[in-house]
Amino acid sequence: MGRGGRRNPGRPRRGSLAFSPRKRASRPVPRIRSWPDEERVRVQGFAGYKAGMTHAIMIDDWPNSPTEGEEISVPVTILDAPPMYVAAIRAYAPTPDGYRCVTEAWAEIPEELEMDRVFTVPKDGEAGDLDKIEELVDEGIVEEIRVIVATQPKKAGVPKKKPDVMEYRIGGKDVRERFEYAVEILSEEIRAKDVFDEGEIVDVSAITKGKGFQGVVKRWGVTIQDRKTQRKQKGRHIGSIGPITPSRVRWTVPMAGQVGYHQRTEHNKRILKIGEDGEEVTPRGGFVNYGVVRGDYIMIHGTVPGPKKRLIRVRPAVRPPKNAPEGAPEILYISRTSQQGVRPKASEDEIVEQLGGPASA
Protein backbone atom coordinates (compact mmCIF):
# COMPACT_ATOMS: atom_id res chain seq x y z
CA MET A 1 0.00 0.00 0.00
CA GLY A 2 1.23 3.50 -0.80
CA ARG A 3 1.53 6.49 1.46
CA GLY A 4 -2.07 7.62 0.98
CA GLY A 5 -5.07 6.84 3.10
CA ARG A 6 -7.67 4.11 2.80
CA ARG A 7 -9.65 5.86 0.09
CA ASN A 8 -6.67 6.74 -2.10
CA PRO A 9 -3.73 4.54 -1.10
CA GLY A 10 -1.50 5.55 -4.02
CA ARG A 11 -1.45 9.30 -3.59
CA PRO A 12 1.73 11.14 -2.52
CA ARG A 13 2.14 12.33 1.04
CA ARG A 14 0.72 15.69 2.07
CA GLY A 15 3.27 18.48 2.10
CA SER A 16 6.98 18.45 1.37
CA LEU A 17 9.80 17.35 3.65
CA ALA A 18 12.34 19.31 1.61
CA PHE A 19 12.15 22.35 3.86
CA SER A 20 12.27 20.56 7.21
CA PRO A 21 12.65 21.61 9.93
CA ARG A 22 10.01 24.28 9.39
CA LYS A 23 11.22 26.67 12.03
CA ARG A 24 11.71 30.40 12.20
CA ALA A 25 14.77 31.93 10.56
CA SER A 26 17.49 32.92 13.01
CA ARG A 27 17.68 36.51 11.76
CA PRO A 28 15.88 38.74 9.24
CA VAL A 29 18.96 38.94 6.99
CA PRO A 30 19.08 35.90 4.66
CA ARG A 31 22.30 33.96 4.18
CA ILE A 32 23.82 33.34 0.75
CA ARG A 33 25.79 30.10 0.65
CA SER A 34 26.68 29.82 -3.05
CA TRP A 35 28.02 32.28 -5.58
CA PRO A 36 28.26 32.20 -9.39
CA ASP A 37 31.64 31.91 -11.08
CA GLU A 38 32.18 34.84 -13.42
CA GLU A 39 35.03 36.82 -14.93
CA ARG A 40 33.58 40.25 -14.18
CA VAL A 41 35.21 41.88 -11.15
CA ARG A 42 32.39 43.30 -9.03
CA VAL A 43 30.51 42.90 -5.79
CA GLN A 44 28.28 39.90 -6.39
CA GLY A 45 25.08 41.28 -4.99
CA PHE A 46 23.10 44.11 -3.51
CA ALA A 47 20.36 44.53 -0.93
CA GLY A 48 17.23 46.64 -0.74
CA TYR A 49 13.96 46.94 1.11
CA LYS A 50 10.71 45.75 -0.42
CA ALA A 51 8.50 48.78 -1.05
CA GLY A 52 5.61 47.18 -2.90
CA MET A 53 4.31 46.15 -6.31
CA THR A 54 2.84 47.82 -9.35
CA HIS A 55 2.66 47.00 -13.05
CA ALA A 56 4.50 48.12 -16.15
CA ILE A 57 3.97 47.92 -19.90
CA MET A 58 7.02 46.79 -21.87
CA ILE A 59 8.02 45.27 -25.18
CA ASP A 60 8.39 41.50 -24.87
CA ASP A 61 11.99 40.70 -25.89
CA TRP A 62 12.18 37.03 -24.91
CA PRO A 63 13.22 34.99 -27.96
CA ASN A 64 10.54 32.69 -29.43
CA SER A 65 7.90 34.08 -27.08
CA PRO A 66 4.33 34.07 -28.49
CA THR A 67 4.19 37.82 -27.80
CA GLU A 68 7.75 38.65 -28.90
CA GLY A 69 7.96 42.24 -30.07
CA GLU A 70 4.53 43.12 -28.71
CA GLU A 71 3.42 45.22 -25.77
CA ILE A 72 2.74 43.22 -22.61
CA SER A 73 1.67 44.18 -19.10
CA VAL A 74 3.82 42.64 -16.37
CA PRO A 75 3.75 42.76 -12.55
CA VAL A 76 6.84 44.34 -11.02
CA THR A 77 8.29 44.64 -7.51
CA ILE A 78 10.01 47.83 -6.39
CA LEU A 79 13.01 47.56 -4.06
CA ASP A 80 14.12 50.68 -2.22
CA ALA A 81 17.90 50.34 -2.65
CA PRO A 82 19.90 53.19 -1.10
CA PRO A 83 23.72 53.03 -1.40
CA MET A 84 25.52 50.48 0.77
CA TYR A 85 28.70 51.22 2.74
CA VAL A 86 31.72 48.92 2.32
CA ALA A 87 32.99 48.45 5.87
CA ALA A 88 35.60 45.68 5.67
CA ILE A 89 37.51 43.21 3.52
CA ARG A 90 37.74 39.54 4.46
CA ALA A 91 40.32 37.08 3.12
CA TYR A 92 39.56 33.36 2.95
CA ALA A 93 41.91 30.40 2.57
CA PRO A 94 40.91 26.85 1.58
CA THR A 95 40.95 24.13 4.25
CA PRO A 96 39.81 20.49 4.27
CA ASP A 97 36.54 21.75 5.77
CA GLY A 98 36.00 24.52 3.24
CA TYR A 99 36.99 28.17 3.14
CA ARG A 100 37.99 29.78 6.44
CA CYS A 101 38.58 33.47 7.13
CA VAL A 102 42.26 34.09 7.89
CA THR A 103 42.15 37.86 8.44
CA GLU A 104 40.12 40.96 7.76
CA ALA A 105 40.70 44.70 7.45
CA TRP A 106 38.15 47.27 8.61
CA ALA A 107 37.60 50.78 7.37
CA GLU A 108 36.87 53.74 9.60
CA ILE A 109 33.12 53.55 10.19
CA PRO A 110 31.29 56.91 10.07
CA GLU A 111 29.23 57.69 13.15
CA GLU A 112 26.09 58.45 11.16
CA LEU A 113 26.01 54.83 9.99
CA GLU A 114 25.35 53.75 13.61
CA MET A 115 26.90 50.33 13.12
CA ASP A 116 27.57 50.16 16.85
CA ARG A 117 23.89 49.26 17.15
CA VAL A 118 24.77 45.91 15.54
CA PHE A 119 28.10 44.99 17.17
CA THR A 120 31.31 46.47 18.51
CA VAL A 121 33.23 47.69 15.50
CA PRO A 122 36.89 46.52 15.55
CA LYS A 123 39.49 49.23 16.07
CA ASP A 124 42.39 49.86 13.72
CA GLY A 125 44.79 46.92 13.84
CA GLU A 126 42.54 44.64 15.91
CA ALA A 127 41.48 42.46 13.02
CA GLY A 128 44.45 42.57 10.69
CA ASP A 129 45.23 45.09 7.95
CA LEU A 130 45.49 45.41 4.21
CA ASP A 131 49.24 44.74 4.15
CA LYS A 132 48.78 41.34 5.74
CA ILE A 133 46.04 40.41 3.27
CA GLU A 134 48.24 41.52 0.37
CA GLU A 135 51.10 39.31 1.59
CA LEU A 136 48.78 36.31 1.85
CA VAL A 137 47.48 36.99 -1.66
CA ASP A 138 51.02 37.14 -3.07
CA GLU A 139 51.91 33.90 -1.28
CA GLY A 140 48.90 32.15 -2.80
CA ILE A 141 47.34 31.34 0.56
CA VAL A 142 44.23 33.47 0.07
CA GLU A 143 41.89 32.30 -2.68
CA GLU A 144 38.68 34.12 -1.79
CA ILE A 145 38.01 37.84 -1.27
CA ARG A 146 34.76 39.13 0.21
CA VAL A 147 33.54 42.43 1.61
CA ILE A 148 31.33 43.28 4.57
CA VAL A 149 28.73 45.87 3.64
CA ALA A 150 26.06 47.71 5.58
CA THR A 151 22.76 49.10 4.39
CA GLN A 152 21.67 52.65 5.16
CA PRO A 153 18.01 52.42 6.22
CA LYS A 154 17.98 56.13 7.09
CA LYS A 155 18.05 56.84 3.35
CA ALA A 156 15.20 54.40 2.69
CA GLY A 157 11.55 54.47 3.68
CA VAL A 158 11.83 51.91 6.48
CA PRO A 159 11.31 53.08 10.08
CA LYS A 160 14.62 51.88 11.48
CA LYS A 161 18.10 53.19 12.25
CA LYS A 162 19.97 49.92 12.74
CA PRO A 163 21.83 48.95 9.55
CA ASP A 164 21.73 45.43 8.17
CA VAL A 165 25.25 44.01 7.88
CA MET A 166 26.06 41.22 5.44
CA GLU A 167 28.86 39.72 3.38
CA TYR A 168 29.27 39.62 -0.40
CA ARG A 169 31.80 37.88 -2.59
CA ILE A 170 33.97 39.79 -5.05
CA GLY A 171 33.59 38.18 -8.46
CA GLY A 172 36.40 37.54 -10.91
CA LYS A 173 39.02 34.96 -11.79
CA ASP A 174 42.26 36.58 -10.59
CA VAL A 175 42.56 36.93 -6.80
CA ARG A 176 44.91 39.90 -7.13
CA GLU A 177 42.42 41.86 -9.25
CA ARG A 178 39.62 41.05 -6.83
CA PHE A 179 41.70 42.26 -3.88
CA GLU A 180 42.65 45.50 -5.64
CA TYR A 181 39.01 46.17 -6.45
CA ALA A 182 38.02 45.52 -2.83
CA VAL A 183 40.66 48.01 -1.64
CA GLU A 184 39.36 50.54 -4.15
CA ILE A 185 35.79 50.43 -2.82
CA LEU A 186 36.72 50.07 0.88
CA SER A 187 35.15 52.85 2.99
CA GLU A 188 33.14 53.94 -0.06
CA GLU A 189 29.47 53.72 -0.98
CA ILE A 190 28.37 51.39 -3.75
CA ARG A 191 25.11 51.75 -5.64
CA ALA A 192 22.89 49.27 -7.40
CA LYS A 193 23.95 50.51 -10.84
CA ASP A 194 27.59 49.74 -9.92
CA VAL A 195 26.70 46.09 -9.36
CA PHE A 196 23.90 45.16 -11.78
CA ASP A 197 22.85 46.01 -15.31
CA GLU A 198 19.32 46.55 -16.53
CA GLY A 199 17.96 43.35 -18.03
CA GLU A 200 20.23 41.09 -15.94
CA ILE A 201 18.95 37.77 -14.56
CA VAL A 202 19.30 37.52 -10.78
CA ASP A 203 18.31 35.43 -7.76
CA VAL A 204 16.50 37.01 -4.82
CA SER A 205 16.62 35.80 -1.21
CA ALA A 206 14.49 36.93 1.70
CA ILE A 207 12.72 35.82 4.86
CA THR A 208 9.09 35.09 4.06
CA LYS A 209 6.06 36.60 5.73
CA GLY A 210 5.50 35.01 9.14
CA LYS A 211 2.19 33.26 9.86
CA GLY A 212 2.81 32.14 13.43
CA PHE A 213 1.76 28.81 14.98
CA GLN A 214 -0.68 26.99 12.66
CA GLY A 215 -2.41 23.63 12.48
CA VAL A 216 -1.73 20.70 10.18
CA VAL A 217 -4.31 21.71 7.56
CA LYS A 218 -2.67 25.05 6.82
CA ARG A 219 0.88 23.85 7.52
CA TRP A 220 0.87 20.56 5.61
CA GLY A 221 -2.28 20.63 3.50
CA VAL A 222 -3.84 17.50 5.00
CA THR A 223 -7.47 16.74 4.18
CA ILE A 224 -10.19 17.99 6.51
CA GLN A 225 -12.05 14.93 7.80
CA ASP A 226 -15.70 14.55 6.86
CA ARG A 227 -18.45 14.70 9.44
CA LYS A 228 -18.73 10.97 10.13
CA THR A 229 -14.96 10.52 10.52
CA GLN A 230 -14.40 13.39 12.93
CA ARG A 231 -13.65 12.88 16.61
CA LYS A 232 -15.53 15.19 18.99
CA GLN A 233 -16.71 17.28 16.03
CA LYS A 234 -13.12 18.23 15.20
CA GLY A 235 -11.89 17.42 11.71
CA ARG A 236 -8.81 19.61 11.28
CA HIS A 237 -6.31 16.98 12.42
CA ILE A 238 -4.64 13.88 11.00
CA GLY A 239 -6.37 10.54 11.37
CA SER A 240 -3.37 8.67 12.79
CA ILE A 241 0.12 9.60 13.93
CA GLY A 242 1.45 6.09 13.28
CA PRO A 243 1.16 2.39 14.16
CA ILE A 244 1.53 0.80 17.59
CA THR A 245 4.89 -0.67 16.55
CA PRO A 246 7.40 0.92 16.38
CA SER A 247 6.29 2.75 19.52
CA ARG A 248 7.60 6.10 18.35
CA VAL A 249 6.23 8.96 16.29
CA ARG A 250 8.23 9.54 13.13
CA TRP A 251 9.50 12.98 12.27
CA THR A 252 7.68 12.80 8.94
CA VAL A 253 4.23 12.84 10.57
CA PRO A 254 2.45 16.19 10.00
CA MET A 255 2.33 18.24 13.18
CA ALA A 256 1.19 21.75 14.04
CA GLY A 257 3.88 24.40 14.33
CA GLN A 258 5.53 27.42 12.78
CA VAL A 259 4.42 28.62 9.34
CA GLY A 260 6.29 31.36 7.52
CA TYR A 261 9.33 33.45 8.45
CA HIS A 262 11.55 31.00 6.58
CA GLN A 263 14.44 31.84 4.27
CA ARG A 264 13.55 31.29 0.64
CA THR A 265 15.42 31.96 -2.61
CA GLU A 266 13.67 32.50 -5.93
CA HIS A 267 15.81 31.97 -9.00
CA ASN A 268 16.00 33.71 -12.37
CA LYS A 269 14.22 36.98 -11.79
CA ARG A 270 14.93 39.79 -14.23
CA ILE A 271 15.90 43.34 -13.38
CA LEU A 272 13.83 45.56 -15.64
CA LYS A 273 15.06 48.95 -14.48
CA ILE A 274 17.54 50.58 -12.09
CA GLY A 275 16.83 54.21 -11.32
CA GLU A 276 17.98 57.05 -9.11
CA ASP A 277 14.67 58.93 -8.69
CA GLY A 278 12.13 56.97 -6.69
CA GLU A 279 9.36 59.32 -7.79
CA GLU A 280 9.38 57.52 -11.15
CA VAL A 281 7.90 54.39 -9.59
CA THR A 282 6.17 55.58 -6.40
CA PRO A 283 2.34 55.56 -6.66
CA ARG A 284 0.43 58.70 -5.77
CA GLY A 285 0.16 58.75 -2.00
CA GLY A 286 3.05 56.30 -1.63
CA PHE A 287 3.10 52.53 -1.30
CA VAL A 288 0.59 51.26 1.24
CA ASN A 289 2.35 50.22 4.48
CA TYR A 290 5.66 51.54 3.17
CA GLY A 291 5.61 55.12 1.97
CA VAL A 292 7.68 56.95 -0.61
CA VAL A 293 10.80 55.68 -2.41
CA ARG A 294 13.10 58.69 -2.18
CA GLY A 295 16.27 57.60 -3.98
CA ASP A 296 17.75 54.62 -5.83
CA TYR A 297 15.47 51.72 -6.66
CA ILE A 298 15.51 48.34 -8.41
CA MET A 299 12.49 47.20 -10.41
CA ILE A 300 12.23 43.40 -10.68
CA HIS A 301 9.86 41.46 -12.91
CA GLY A 302 7.42 39.43 -10.82
CA THR A 303 7.23 38.86 -7.09
CA VAL A 304 9.82 38.41 -4.36
CA PRO A 305 9.46 36.70 -0.96
CA GLY A 306 8.65 38.59 2.21
CA PRO A 307 6.35 41.40 3.32
CA LYS A 308 6.87 45.09 2.73
CA LYS A 309 9.87 46.66 4.51
CA ARG A 310 11.64 43.25 4.51
CA LEU A 311 15.29 43.15 3.45
CA ILE A 312 15.73 41.53 0.01
CA ARG A 313 19.17 40.31 -1.08
CA VAL A 314 19.88 40.12 -4.80
CA ARG A 315 22.79 38.27 -6.44
CA PRO A 316 23.67 37.28 -10.03
CA ALA A 317 21.87 34.13 -11.09
CA VAL A 318 23.75 30.90 -10.43
CA ARG A 319 21.83 29.02 -13.16
CA PRO A 320 20.58 31.63 -15.66
CA PRO A 321 18.44 30.48 -18.60
CA LYS A 322 20.37 30.06 -21.83
CA ASN A 323 17.80 31.89 -23.95
CA ALA A 324 17.53 34.97 -21.73
CA PRO A 325 17.41 38.26 -23.66
CA GLU A 326 20.43 40.54 -23.48
CA GLY A 327 20.33 44.21 -22.69
CA ALA A 328 17.79 46.45 -21.04
CA PRO A 329 14.13 45.95 -21.98
CA GLU A 330 12.07 48.73 -23.52
CA ILE A 331 9.66 49.97 -20.85
CA LEU A 332 6.80 52.10 -22.13
CA TYR A 333 4.87 52.82 -18.96
CA ILE A 334 5.08 52.33 -15.19
CA SER A 335 1.82 52.56 -13.28
CA ARG A 336 1.79 55.22 -10.57
CA THR A 337 -1.93 55.04 -9.90
CA SER A 338 -2.82 55.59 -6.26
CA GLN A 339 -3.07 52.39 -4.21
CA GLN A 340 -4.95 54.22 -1.45
CA GLY A 341 -8.32 53.76 -3.13
CA VAL A 342 -8.58 57.50 -3.87
CA ARG A 343 -8.41 58.79 -7.42
CA PRO A 344 -6.61 62.16 -7.51
CA LYS A 345 -8.10 65.02 -9.46
CA ALA A 346 -6.38 65.49 -12.82
CA SER A 347 -4.69 68.80 -13.54
CA GLU A 348 -5.66 70.99 -16.47
CA ASP A 349 -2.54 70.00 -18.41
CA GLU A 350 -3.30 66.29 -17.92
CA ILE A 351 -6.88 66.79 -19.14
CA VAL A 352 -5.72 68.68 -22.23
CA GLU A 353 -3.07 66.02 -22.94
CA GLN A 354 -5.63 63.21 -22.64
CA LEU A 355 -7.88 65.03 -25.11
CA GLY A 356 -5.02 65.29 -27.59
CA GLY A 357 -4.44 69.04 -27.35
CA PRO A 358 -1.14 70.84 -26.68
CA ALA A 359 -0.14 71.24 -23.04
CA SER A 360 0.38 74.72 -21.67
CA ALA A 361 3.93 75.99 -21.41
Swiss-Prot record:
This is Large ribosomal subunit protein uL3. Belongs to the universal ribosomal protein uL3 family. Residues 1-14 have a biased composition (Basic residues). Part of the 50S ribosomal subunit. Forms a cluster with proteins L14 and L24e. Keywords: Ribonucleoprotein, Ribosomal protein, RNA-binding, rRNA-binding. The keyword RNA-binding applies. It holds the Pfam family Ribosomal_L3. Residues 1-33, 337-361 are annotated as: Disordered. One of its GO terms (cellular component) is cytosolic large ribosomal subunit. Coiled coil: none annotated. It comes from the Archaea. SUPFAM superfamilies: Translation proteins. GO terms for molecular function: rRNA binding; structural constituent of ribosome. NCBIfam families: L3_arch, PRK04231.1. The gene is rpl3. GO terms for biological process: translation. The keyword rRNA-binding applies. One of the primary rRNA binding proteins, it binds directly near the 3'-end of the 23S rRNA, where it nucleates assembly of the 50S subunit.
